[in-house]
Amino acid sequence: MCPCPLHRGRGPPAVCACSAGRLGLRSSAAQLTAARLKALGDELHQRTMWRRRARSRRAPAPGALPTYWPWLCAAAQVAALAAWLLGRRNL
């Protein structure tokens, strides 16, 4: 019978989607997503910092946030998805 609390013994562990192999795949997918998110954040930081250093004595440009807003939204959605996947793994 399946030992996971989600299925409460409804079938053999080999049939359960929560088997160790599946959890390992979810974990590696979440880690891959986290690595991609970190790379995206590093690239975004690099793109904004060289501009900030180039015009450090001038006023900040108001158009910088609308330029990167889609990237920030995408990064937030990916982070939420990774957190959701990790939360489901700990059930």
Curated annotation (Swiss-Prot):
UniProt keyword ATP-binding present: no
Residue ranges crossing the lipid bilayer per the database entry: 69-87
GO cellular component: membrane; mitochondrion
Motif placement: BH3: 33-47
Disulfide bonds: none
Family annotation (InterPro entries): Apoptosis_activator_harakiri, Bcl2_BH3_motif_CS
Pfam families for the chain: Harakiri
Keywords for the protein's UniProt record, in alphabetical order: Apoptosis, Membrane, Mitochondrion, Transmembrane, Transmembrane helix
Biological processes per GO annotation: apoptotic process; cellular response to potassium ion starvation; positive regulation of apoptotic process; positive regulation of neuron apoptotic process; positive regulation of protein-containing complex assembly; positive regulation of release of cytochrome c from mitochondria
Membrane topology: Single-pass membrane protein
Subcellular location field: Membrane; Mitochondrion
SUBUNIT field: Interacts with BCL2 and BCL2L1. Interacts with C1QBP.
Domain notes: The BH3 motif is required for the induction of cell death.
General function of this protein: Promotes apoptosis.
Protein name: Activator of apoptosis harakiri
